[in-house]
Amino acid sequence: MNNSNRIRLTWISYLSYALTGALVIVTGIVMGNIAEYFNLPIASMSNTFTFLNAGILISIFLNAWLMEIIPLKRQLVFGFILMLIAIAGLMVGHNLMIFSISMFIFGVVSGITMSIGTFLVTHMYEGRQRGSRLLFTDSFFSMAGMIFPIAAAMLLARHIEWYWVYACIGLLYVGIFVLTLCSEFPVLGHKATDQSKPVVKEKWGVGVLFLAIAALCYILGQLGFIQWVPEYATKTFNMNISQAGQLVSNFWISYMIGMWIFSFILRFFDLQRIVTVLAAMATLAMYLFVSTDNPAYLSYYILALGFVSSAIYTTLITLGSLQTKVSSPKLVNFILTCGTVGTMLTFVVTGPIVANNGVHAALATANGLYLAVFILCLALGFFTKHRSHGHVTH
């Protein structure tokens, strides 16, 4: 693979994560306007966005097998057509069913592109460089999550219809589409096998199970924590909504900075050891946030939490990809799917806890999930195969 083609494929990976970040995080900005557009209460409207998450989950799960059947280039070109259909549906369709279908299509396209983007990085880069590249790729999720809500707010403030926000997000896929047409993609499945060599299926090992459960616990813990921080800050410490929102902003800004810094640092450390240390530090930072009685300390603790936890999820995925000698799209997508299940379970798990025991109990549960991630990462040290496969150098 020549260098210019590798760069194009890497940028497809970057934009795939930016697309998912924009679609998921912009929801909170446009939800009120969409509810008003359909003349529905905002609580009812929020349920329809489940179609977006469902589309992401289903497509990531299925694409573990589809990648070996349908060429990656064809999938991305087809995704562009689906993206146009979904945006057109939002613009010309004026009923809730078409909106829900469009959201599901967005989710499917997002899941397909993100799973392809993740595989491309794990396929093109080896060892610790894979971890740093994947982490930098993941930072585009957060970057889009910061840029597009601001852009959406500007459009809505100028009384431009909400569906133009999704048209703007669609521009990211235009970039993916153009790069796709100019690029050559790795061939997977039976076509990729060397006929002179027998195909040997590698066993994943128990380490993959540990990583998958850790990914689920991490995402469930992170979202279960950050979704309830504003409520906790306003109810427990009598902060106004602006101050509570600033805590959340501090978390994501610190998270993004952490991603950039760790993308350079990770290549110098053994991934299993560094993720164990980071999980321990994140658990401690969250414990300090949840247990403090002084609101002045909350910003410091959440900044620390965002920074040290920024590399955990991507490192879990990277370690998963290193459990086999040849990177497996099924393995990577399995861990991604488990993480996405954590997203889907956020309110299913934390909602009843808040209703019965209060917001503090939900945050304590999130802290317990982070502790579980630490224990799983520690135990992984006895089962991981990344060292025996020679994946500990650049």
From Swiss-Prot:
This is Protein TsgA homolog. Its main location: membrane. The gene is tsgA. One of its GO terms (molecular function) is transmembrane transporter activity. Gene3D superfamilies: MFS general substrate transporter like domains (1.20.1250.20). Keywords: Cell inner membrane, Cell membrane, Membrane, Transmembrane, Transmembrane helix. The keyword Nuclease does not apply. InterPro entries: MFS, MFS_dom, MFS_trans_sf, MFS_TsgA, MFS_TsgA-like. Belongs to the major facilitator superfamily. TsgA family. One of its GO terms (cellular component) is plasma membrane. It is found in: Cell inner membrane. Pfam families: MFS_1. It is a multi-pass membrane protein. PROSITE patterns: MFS. The chain crosses the membrane at residues 11-31, 51-71, 76-96, 101-121, 134-154, 162-182, 206-226, 246-266, 274-294, 302-322, 334-354, 363-383.
